[in-house]
């Protein structure tokens, strides 16, 4: 597998952003996945206080992915809650809309198919994963690990 640290200019946020990507070993990929631009992708969103490095520093993600055919994308969003707000930056647009387009330029073999596109997150990232998955048609599966899913609800 290969590990990429990418810094790109986010037009949506008006600043440089960072994203880490784990790309599967070519020997693990099928010819159809490569030829059809159909490598599955998982977006992993960090929690509050985290960044694009959190999943690698705090989990065994690389060991778990050693023999898979999955691209894993780990962006940084500061404390943006993966949300567009009136007084803050449009982090929802940056992650849900802009980032997949940016990554497709770097990784043209990454799938565009909903059934092979997944999203998950921890805490704040769990909230973001559900918010993005439920408000777009891009993701077939979503997971929230200790996500703050009841924000704004009474009791």
Residue ranges and their predicted role:
Residues 1-155:
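Non-catalytic cap/lid and distal C-terminal segments of serine-dependent acyl enzymes
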């Amino acid at each position: 597998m290969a590990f990429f640290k990418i810094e790109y200019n986010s037009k949506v946020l008006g600043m440089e952003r960072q994203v880490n990507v784990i790309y599967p070993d070519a020997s693990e990929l099928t010819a159809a996945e490569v030829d059809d631009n159909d490598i599955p992708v998982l977006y992993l969103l960090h929690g509050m206080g985290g960044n694009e490095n959190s999943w690698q520093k705090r989990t065994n993600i690389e060991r778990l992915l050693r023999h898979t055919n999955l691209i894993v994308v780990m962006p940084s969003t500061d404390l943006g809650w993966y949300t567009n707000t009136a007084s803050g930056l449009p982090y929802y647009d940056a992650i849900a809309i802009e980032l997949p387009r940016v990554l497709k330029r770097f990784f043209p073999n990454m799938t565009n198919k909903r059934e092979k596109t997944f999203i998950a997150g921890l805490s704040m990232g769990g909230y973001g994963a559900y918010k993005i998955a439920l408000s777009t048609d891009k993701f077939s599966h979503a997971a929230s690990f200790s996500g703050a899913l009841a924000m704004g609800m009474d009791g």
